[in-house]
Amino acid sequence: MPEPSKSAPAPKKGSKKAVTKAQKKDGKKRKRSRKESYSVYVYKVLKQVHPDTGISSKAMGIMNSFVNDIFERIAGEASRLAHYNKRSTITSREIQTAVRLLLPGELAKHAVSEGTKAVTKYTSSK
């Protein structure tokens, strides 16, 4: 049985072929695509609740996934509610109802009160 063929040998030191993939033809480096996340906001909330506590990058990744998941669930439920009521706009009322439907008991009450507080603060600052 023949050996599996290996990829091209690595270029030698000083070789002109050793141009990285991140470089364009004119020598400029390609700009890295920005990865959006909630890490800044998770960190701010953590410092409000536990000022002396840190968070690992793995835990931050988990928190980011959690926030994305909850966002998608609430947005999906709010969209469904708007569709049921033949509305084309998702308002704070749909979001509030979606939160009440998705989150259990006391957690929903706290989320609704915090949301109402945030909306009030936003509208008063305008």
UniProtKB/Swiss-Prot annotation:
Provenance organism: Homo sapiens
Gene: H2BC15
Keyword terms, alphabetized: Acetylation, ADP-ribosylation, Chromosome, DNA-binding, Glycoprotein, Hydroxylation, Isopeptide bond, Methylation, Nucleosome core, Nucleus, Phosphoprotein, Ubl conjugation
Amino acid composition bias (Low complexity), ranges on this chain: 1-12
Modified residues (N-acetylproline): 2
Similarity comment text for this entry: Belongs to the histone H2B family.
Protein modification: Monoubiquitination at Lys-35 (H2BK34Ub) by the MSL1/MSL2 dimer is required for histone H3 'Lys-4' (H3K4me) and 'Lys-79' (H3K79me) methylation and transcription activation at specific gene loci, such as HOXA9 and MEIS1 loci. Similarly, monoubiquitination at Lys-121 (H2BK120Ub) by the RNF20/40 complex gives a specific tag for epigenetic transcriptional activation and is also prerequisite for histone H3 'Lys-4' and 'Lys-79' methylation. It also functions cooperatively with the FACT dimer to stimulate elongation by RNA polymerase II.
Record-listed N6-butyryllysine modification sites: 6, 21
Name used for this protein in its record: Histone H2B type 1-N
Cross-referenced PANTHER family: HISTONE H2B
